[in-house]
Curated annotation (Swiss-Prot):
Lineage: Bacteria, Bacillati, Actinomycetota, Actinomycetes, Mycobacteriales
GO biological process: methylation
Gene3D superfamilies the record matches: Vaccinia Virus protein VP39
This protein's UniProt keywords: Methyltransferase, S-adenosyl-L-methionine, Transferase
Residue positions binding S-adenosyl-L-methionine: 127, 156-157
Signal peptide annotation: none
Protein name: Putative S-adenosyl-L-methionine-dependent methyltransferase MMAR_4850
GO molecular function, one term: methyltransferase activity
Highest rank taxon of the organism: Bacteria
EC number: 2.1.1.-
Pfam families: LCM (PF04072)
Function: Exhibits S-adenosyl-L-methionine-dependent methyltransferase activity.
Disulfide-bond pairs as recorded: none
Length: 301
């Protein structure tokens, strides 16, 4: 389904289904056969959403497929790299004394329940009302308890989320730690710039920010990726990122942030694999995404 300016979704449709996909990949990385991360909530959340292919994935019912290149172990390693990057970001930020955390487009992220937060930490989760409600109720049914003070901000990021965040108690005069995981490709250029401008306006000196970005979204229309997607669709993986992401010219996010006083450090997906002791796959599909860039930044102004 091609995006529209005011489209909406839940966790089984459009952009929302990508949150379920990511949670399924986290569940795979947390599965005892790999045990690369600790996330006991990913699998039950995915099962509760009920998308067949992702339920089968977390249940171990989709084996290696040579023709499509699907390999559960490879998927687990890639998601472990991403998850560890954001986990470590929050651990380091809160150990430095930051006590308010904002998870933008939180989806099925369960960090408010699974990380060992210092006493007094407040975690704000920002996402669509339907997404926030589903996760909150499902985790309550599972008997899960937050390990920090969790405050939900049920708002579309295309609306005035900054006002909603402050109404929930966020203090812009206190340093904060922000994540925009798996978000930027789903925003048009002007919305991406506005997102970072809002983050900067709400951030005190010493605040931290983590995100990843795709340097060129044309990769989703690359012939190698299109062929891979067609083969994966036969296994039931039907999400077509080419329809969900926004293409075209974008501001260079690192340069944009630097102008506002953010000092950044970045690593490519290939570099993160090496840092985590994994070999980056040597094939055409992996090559398309080797330059996805993971960035952490500190506001110095």
């Amino acid at each position: 389904m091609v995006r529209t300016d005011r489209d909406r979704w839940d966790l089984a449709t459009s952009v929302g289904a990508t949150a379920t996909m990511v949670a399924a990949q986290r569940a795979l990385a947390a599965d005892p056969q790999y045990a690369l991360i600790d996330d006991p909530y990913a699998a039950p959340l995915v099962r509760a959403v009920g998308i067949d292919v992702y339920t089968r994935l977390v249940n171990g019912q989709i084996p290696v497929d040579v023709e499509s290149g699907f390999d559960p172990a490879r998927m687990a390693e890639a998601m472990a790299c991403r998850t560890r990057f954001y986990d470590q970001f929050f651990v380091e930020a809160t150990r430095s004394g930051i006590s308010q955390v904002v998870i933008l487009a939180s989806g099925l992220d369960a960090r408010a329940y699974r990380l060992d937060w210092p006493a007094g930490t407040v975690v704000y989760e920002v996402d669509m009302p339907e997404v926030i409600e589903f996760k909150t109720l499902t985790l309550a049914d599972l008997g899960a308890e937050p390990t920090a003070e969790r405050r939900t901000v049920a708002v579309d990021l295309r609306d005035d989320w900054a006002a909603a965040l402050q109404a929930a108690g966020f203090d812009k005069d206190v340093p904060s730690a922000w994540s925009a995981e798996g978000l930027l490709v789903y925003l048009p250029d002007d919305a991406q710039d506005a997102l970072f401008d809002n983050i900067t306006a709400l951030s005190a000196t010493g605040s931290r920010l983590a995100f990843e970005f795709v340097p060129d979204t044309a990769v989703f229309n690359d012939e190698r990726w299109r062929s891979h997607h067609a083969r994966m669709s036969e296994l039931g993986f039907e999400i077509d990122f080419n329809d969900l992401v926004y293409h075209g010219q974008r501001s260079h996010v690192i340069d944009h942030l630097a102008r506002d006083g953010w000092q950044s450090a970045s690593h490519t997906a290939k570099e993160l694999h090496a840092a985590n002791g994994f070999d980056y796959p040597d094939d055409d599909i992996a090559a398309v995404f080797a330059d996805i860039t993971y960035t952490s930044a500190v506001l110095g102004r």
